[in-house]
Design a protein with these regions (language model features):
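Hydrophobic, small-residue-rich alpha-helical packing segments that form membrane-like cores
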Residues: 151-222, 226-244, 248-275, 281-283, ...
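Non-catalytic, conformational "gating/processing" segments within enzyme and secreted inhibitor domains
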Residues: 159, 211-243, 721-755, 942-943
Length: 969
């Protein structure tokens, strides 16, 4: 391709090689429609398409968010109720979603299959450029909000998917803090309103305002199109032009993101947030001290990432230490945000009280001034720079398509008419920042952007009991008044509208409409699965598992310690160990020096606790603590040295440090517990059902309960060092560990030579691996919060009723998630979503999230067997669900994920042929196989294992459903 030539209406303006991502970028403009396009040519088979629009709302009605939902509810070529859902059911996509940001809305898809990729592009382009919602107000009612009234004498209520989703968001204290912070920092721009929607304002949105927002924002002239991967780009350009863009003429768009004028002086404000009537209020205040930064170059953006890591993220972070030691908060963190037009930097403290507000500002400013006057610790900065650089070079996004990460990064410049490719380059910036370590580069950055900057806000939110109840009463009173002003005819119109919406939601799409969605053939599916090679060797009596992988010069190491040698009570201390590993003193030095060393030489060091079930076994599992580390191969000696130090030389005697970490852990849980709702309630149900379920709950809600108790019991904290040391001695033995090493051929020998002399110093005491006896929970729990919505879970174990895990169960998961539960719980019930999972140990769970209902959702679960017995599908529909299921089984594997995959198969005893057989069962699934699962589901549901977390009144109104009512805090 040549610059200034036109290809299917696209003028090629620029070609640029980007070595950092091993790709070549082509920047183009569609001459007729005004659409912008960037294509990155890369050998990656995981192709990505994205179309984004600059969306700049002027209020908090959530119009941009409701638009994102609504355009995916039918279009010109695909006149179904929800083409998006039909795609999810039957696509081999590796990513399919839509995202609303404060100033943009993105519609990305990805797939490795060429036909599938084309189909995804076609459906998404038709959705955003020709949506049915332009002329169909009922879609906005369903996805946004509407009055609901089943009978004229009933109470008037609000319902809507986004309305309930955002009620859930606003139930998390950190979301409330974020919203208030943005409102105070940007009172005059789009960032001062909530693009996602504030539940108090969503119901102000009119359909006419919605239509106008679409007209202004959803035109190709306001679009940003992105293509990435190994493809025939000229074919893709021809498709974009012929099918879509050639039918539009360029227009002048006025969606620019305005600049907030800098403040002449900072602000200090505080707001209440709601907690449950029995939740504690002490140490539950959250603070955010934020700055809007002056013009920031891409190099300075990267420097701020380094600075934030050094000041607030590392265990040696001086600003974090100053705030924690002054008792400002139990957990101190911060972040730098450059995905908006005016970047911002913030320091946050949780586990605090409102009377600490002034102290927080004073300590932040005085500490930064002192650091500038005396000079920042250059070793600490270099360690943080190395950590950030490693993440850039590794480019691992947990299996998500890498092209998606690139376009999200590019939009941070592209959206504001700056150079989009500039942000994909980082080598020159790294060189300049590294040079700056020897001077006052970072000190100057702090002075210019923070200390001499009055565009700052200190926002605090404090807990207030009864606040949500008062708000609910106000809404109820308002709706009563609204209804009282209605004429009988208006009331009847809402009753009829409610009926119409429900009939619409219940009515199936026509066969003709369903056939409009392109579908792959079963012959496009591969029943085979890539084998991840794993080779065993020995260092003394310790097994080493080598997973040979092309890793771009990075090694991944995992120490898998068996926890079967512990008692159930000791698992709590193992969880604490996992949480603090690498963050406490060792016999060789203090934790600050250790943290610098880790960041200087490693790409990361972490630990987690997990349980891997034995394949097909009801209650057999391996409980594990996994200590992971990663580094460049050239740093392998440092990796081995450091992982040995944190495991074998940890010093648990620093009472003050342990107390800080316990308080920090509790503060994090206080802040995030509601967001973890679906995980909490699902595992709480499983804790009634199986030993592995109780084990997982011990590290989840059970851990939160115990860490809260420990944090509030000064008498117990002095006993902690001895408990931790005792549990560590039991776990960290040479004959109690399996070692994973991921690297390239020829690297294993170096690793074994480095680890051998270290392992030889480890304890080899023989302990029984039959100590761990798990006691299940009894009774259904209702976990009460100040939240506005619920998480509702029910489950059990089908092995108890004589059944085993088979392929059709995975197909049923897809059917339930995107058909039965989607329609009954999301579309009709107004929840954000629901899912079902069937596991090979027999455990089975149904769970809804951000759900306005409780008893109604349990009834949906109860009626599932009847739905299954009446289940019928055409061959085409069955094929669709099979394809969608195979997509969920075929998640991409990055080098970082290959080792854990191989170790998972090792500990579970799963054979490759077992996985292939399971996939064959999925591909061969027939409707009658789904019908037969009614007999599996019904007895499990009758076992009546339930857990809900959510609104206090809803849980109390459910009556005898719950045996135990527990406060979240």
């Amino acid at each position: 391709m040549e610059i200034n030539k036109v290809y299917s209406g696209f003028r090629l303006d620029r070609i640029e090689r980007i070595d950092e991502i091993n790709g070549t970028a082509y920047e183009m403009k569609h001459e007729k429609s005004g659409a912008r396009l960037i294509y990155i040519d890369s050998p990656d088979s995981n192709k990505v398409f994205n179309i984004a629009f600059r969306t700049t709302p002027h209020n908090s009605t959530g119009v941009a968010h409701i638009m994102e939902h609504s355009v995916l509810c039918g279009s010109r070529k695909f006149p179904l109720k929800e083409p998006f859902v039909e795609l999810v059911k039957g696509s081999l996509n590796t990513f399919l979603n839509a995202m609303t940001y404060p100033d943009k809305t993105m519609y990305p898809v990805a797939s490795k299959n060429d036909k599938d990729f084309h189909n995804l592009m076609d459906v998404y382009l038709d959705a955003v450029l020709y949506p049915r919602v332009r002329d169909d107000a009922e879609i906005v009612m369903q996805e946004g909000w509407h009055y609901e009234l089943d009978n004229a004498e009933d109470e008037l209520t609000y319902k809507g998917v986004v309305f309930n989703e955002m009620k859930g968001v606003y139930s998390s204290p950190d979301s409330v803090l974020e919203r208030q912070m943005m409102r105070e920092l940007f009172p005059d721009t789009t960032y001062g309103v909530d693009s996602g929607g504030d539940p108090d304002h969503i119901t102000d949105l009119t359909y006419e305002e919605f239509q106008e927002f679409y007209r202004v924002h959803y035109h190709p002239s306001n679009s940003y199109i992105f293509l990435y991967g190994d493809m025939n780009i000229e074919e893709q350009l021809a498709f974009l032009n012929d099918e879509y863009l050639s039918h539009f003429d360029a227009i002048e768009v006025n969606t620019e993101v305005g600049l907030q004028a800098p403040f002449t002086e900072g602000k200090v404000v505080s707001y209440p947030y709601s907690v449950g009537s029995e939740e504690p209020t002490d140490n539950r205040t959250l603070h955010s001290f934020a700055y809007v930064l002056p013009d920031v170059t891409p190099e300075h953006s990267l420097a701020f990432e380094v600075l934030t890591h050094a000041l607030l993220t590392s265990p040696a972070a001086p600003l974090k230490q100053a705030l924690v030691k002054a008792g400002i908060g139990s957990d101190v963190s911060g972040y730098y945000l450059d995905s908006i037009r005016q970047p911002m930097w913030t320091v946050q403290a949780t586990g605090s009280n409102l009377d600490k507000q002034a102290d927080l500002q004073r300590i932040v400013e005085s500490t930064l001034q002192e650091l500038c006057d005396n000079g920042l610790d250059k070793e600490l900065l270099e360690a943080s720079l190395n950590s950030i650089e490693f993440a850039l070079r590794e480019s691992d996004f947990g299996g998500r398509p890498i092209g998606l990460a690139y376009v999200i990064r590019m939009m941070d410049n592209w959206l504001y008419d700056n150079d989009p490719l500039e942000l994909l380059h980082y080598e020159e910036a790294l060189v300049n920042i590294r040079k700056g370590l020897s001077g006052t580069y970072f000190e100057d950055l702090i002075r210019q952007s923070i200390l001499n900057n009055n565009h700052k806000v200190l926002v605090s939110i404090y807990p207030e009991r009864g606040l949500q109840e008062r708000k609910d009463a106000e809404v109820k009173e308002h709706l009563t008044a609204v209804k009282a002003k209605m004429s009988p005819e208006e009331i009847e119109a809402i009753v009829e509208q409610t009926k119409r919406l429900k009939l619409r939601q219940e009515a199936p799409d026509s066969d003709e409409a369903l056939a409009s969605i392109p579908l792959l053939e079963l012959s496009d599916l591969n029943p085979n699965i890539e084998e991840v090679e794993r080779r065993e060797s020995k260092i003394g009596n310790t097994t080493v598992h080598f997973v040979p992988t092309f890793t771009k010069g990075i090694n991944y190491v995992g120490l898998y310690f068996n926890l079967s040698c512990l008692t159930e009570d000791e698992l709590f201390y193992a969880d604490i160990l996992s949480d603090i590993i690498g963050r406490i003193d060792t016999s060789e030095r203090g934790y600050e020096a250790l943290a610098k060393d880790i960041n200087m030489n490693l790409g990361g060091l972490s630990s987690d606790i997990t349980a891997i079930s034995k394949d097909g076994k009801r209650d057999e599992f391996t409980p594990l603590m996994i200590v992971r580390a990663k580094a460049l191969h050239s740093k392998l000696p440092d990796l081995c040295r450091l992982i040995n130090e944190v495991v074998q030389k940890a010093d648990y005697s620093n009472d003050r440090r342990l107390t800080e970490l316990v308080q920090e852990s509790k503060a994090i849980w206080d802040n995030e517990a509601f967001r973890r709702g679906n995980s909490i309630v699902s595992q709480r149900v499983m804790a009634q059902v199986s030993a592995v379920g109780k084990f997982r709950d011990n590290g989840n809600f059970g851990y939160y309960q115990k860490i809260s108790e420990l944090a509030s019991n000064p008498a117990a904290l002095p006993l902690l060092p001895e408990k931790l040391a005792d549990v560590a001695r039991k776990i960290f033995r040479a004959n109690n560990v399996d070692i994973m090493f991921v690297g390239e051929e020829g690297e294993l020998e170096a690793f074994e030579n480095l680890m051998k002399p270290l392992i030889e110093t480890w304890d080899t005491t023989e302990l029984s691996n039959d100590t761990l006896k798990i006691t299940r929970l009894s009774g259904n729990d209702g976990i009460v919060t100040a939240g506005k919505v619920q998480y509702v879970a029910q489950g059990g174990n089908f092995v108890d009723h004589g059944y085993k895990h088979v392929g059709p169960m995975s197909v049923l998961e897809t059917i339930l998630r995107y058909e039965y539960l989607w329609i009954r719980i999301r579309v009709q019930g107004g929840a954000y979503g629901a899912f079902a999972n069937f596991y090979d140990d027999g455990n089975m769970i149904f769970c809804s999230y951000r759900d306005p209902n409780l008893v109604e959702t349990l009834n949906v679960y109860k009626e599932l067997p009847q739905y299954l017995r009446e289940f019928t599908l055409t061959d085409r529909e069955m094929r669709k669900y099979i394809i969608g299921t195979m997509s969920s089984l075929d998640l991409p594997m990055t080098p970082a994920l290959r080792g854990p995959r191989a170790m998972g198969m090792y500990f579970s005893g799963t054979k490759l042929e077992d996985k292939v057989e399971f996939r064959k069962q999925v591909i061969a699934c027939k409707p009658e196989d789904i019908v037969a699962l009614a007999d599996v589901v019904e007895p499990v549901l009758k076992d009546n294992h339930i857990c809900t977390m959510g609104n206090e009144q809803k849980i109390k109104d459910a009556g005898k459903v719950f045996d135990n009512i527990i406060s979240l805090g």
